Amino acid sequence: MIDKLDGQQEPKVEILDINDHVQESSDPVVPHERQIIDDIIAIWKEDPSSESLGVPKLHAKVKSRHPTWSVSEKRVRTLLKTYGLITTNQQFTYANEIHSRIVSSIELPPKVKVTMTAKRGKGLYAKTQIRKGDLIWEERPLFFVPALANVKLVRTGRACAYCAKLLTQRSSTGLSALRGLDCNVCPELWCSKDCKTLDTLHAKLKHNMSSHSNGKGSNLIDASGFIALEDYCFQEQWNALYAITLIYAEMQADKTRTKAEYFSSMARVSQKVRYKAINSSAGSFDTMQGGALFVMEQQEALWNEGYQKFLKVFPSAHDQVPFEEFMMMMGTYNINNLDSCIFLTQSHLNHSCHPNTDVQASTASRTGPLKVFAARDIKAGEELTTSYVNPSHTLHQRQRELRVNWGFICSCQRCKDEAKEHHRRKSSNGMGAKEVPSNIREMLKDTKSAIGNSEIELEIPTVQGGERRKSVRFDEHVISVNQ
């Protein structure tokens, strides 16, 4: 529609609501506790530095975002404590429920020894002085886990049958067959001779469809059960179940039982215990969801369903892997994996927010060797450490991620120093606007000191087990111009 003024055309401007935006009522409203927690989490995600705000200032921010909300400072404080979002000594930790042991048969790098201590548990220590930049060791995965997201592409020959790397059109057609990189039973292909050699489980997992054969080895793995489990893991985005299925298959195929011995010696904890920490921290906040995936009853039902599918892959595992051991395997995998894979020597490294090693994954291939360098000079007898979390995160972020995912509250020197600085700022008149640039410079300086010249890999937010939003909000309103 066009309005005509003095013979000229002038567009008519109209304000429209888009997406799922709902205009808040001007009447006072008492929000649900989940709404308050979700809003606080949103504030922290938008500005990580706001996580260090005291309750009064945080309450003021919530009120400024939702003027009609009837919520007191006392209620905000109570909810933060209830959901484990205030760092206190009463927060749930499970480090004392994690157990590991030393296996003498492990071949360690020449400059490294493994030691068990009462305070740190099992860890790696330097036998001699190590210079900054020295390669301490390199290793291939003990258990390789391909990308779950590519399993459908693997089945149609569009991704490598072992490493799941995407194949080009040229490599996924006749050329691979000529090079002997195709399977003569199914459509799957390998990207290289190395991957084909490493893929010792392909026939057992993909072609052994009968679990009732009289052959002793043929009934260890039921391929039809594995394909069903693979589909289920893909649908639920459940990487841990997929991973421990592959790990158990590897252990079953290892006649020396060495791999089973190594896996059982790693830091072990039940996934049930880890889930308590998730529930005590406003759900899976650190997986960008802002809420628990399921209430405990639903989660236990999911675990049981996964366990039943696991048993269909391994018909003889009913006695060898009871449900509690299944949960222990899942917890063990979750606290030891690096980029979904398990590395034997690297799994011995304990955490520090100011680590003295630089762990670098292979840039050429996920199946390639992991390399561990000295990030600074390391004295003989000094413990080797790595960072389990992104060192550029704030103190509160790091502490929460470590408590939920690994069961402890870090007390390294960097955390102590930052905690003292945080308390000093809180006891002062507050951080003024003029102090912000200097604080940012200090943060960047600390991060540079922590990570050296290595790059920071930022995680892509994912939602596990949930659906993506079907709309994208760019603004509360959009201007529509009709001409």
UniProtKB/Swiss-Prot annotation:
- Supply the alphabetized keyword list: Chromosome, Cytoplasm, Methyltransferase, Nucleus, S-adenosyl-L-methionine, Transferase
Q: Does the keyword Isomerase apply?
A: no
Q: Which SMART domains match?
A: SET
Entry EC number(s): 2.1.1.-
What Pfam families would the database entry show? SET (PF00856)
Gene Ontology molecular function, alphabetical: histone H4K20 methyltransferase activity
Q: Give a Gene Ontology cellular component term annotated to this protein.
A: cytoplasm
Chain spans, region Disordered: 420-439
Gene Ontology terms: biological process: methylation; negative regulation of gene expression, epigenetic
CDD domains attached here?
A: SET_SMYD (cd20071)
Matching InterPro entries: SET_dom (IPR001214), SET_dom_sf (IPR046341)
Q: Which domain of life is it from?
A: Eukaryota
Q: Please indicate if the UniProt record lists Nucleotidyltransferase as a keyword.
A: no
Q: What does this protein do?
A: Histone methyltransferase that monomethylates 'Lys-5', 'Lys-8' and 'Lys-12' of histone H4 (H4K5me1, H4K8me1 and H4K12me1, respectively), thereby controlling gene expression and remodeling chromatin structures.
- Give the UniProt family note: Belongs to the class V-like SAM-binding methyltransferase superfamily. Histone-lysine methyltransferase family. SET5 subfamily.
Q: What protein is this chain from?
A: Histone-lysine N-methyltransferase SET5
The organism encoding this protein is: Meyerozyma guilliermondii (strain ATCC 6260 / CBS 566 / DSM 6381 / JCM 1539 / NBRC 10279 / NRRL Y-324) (Yeast)
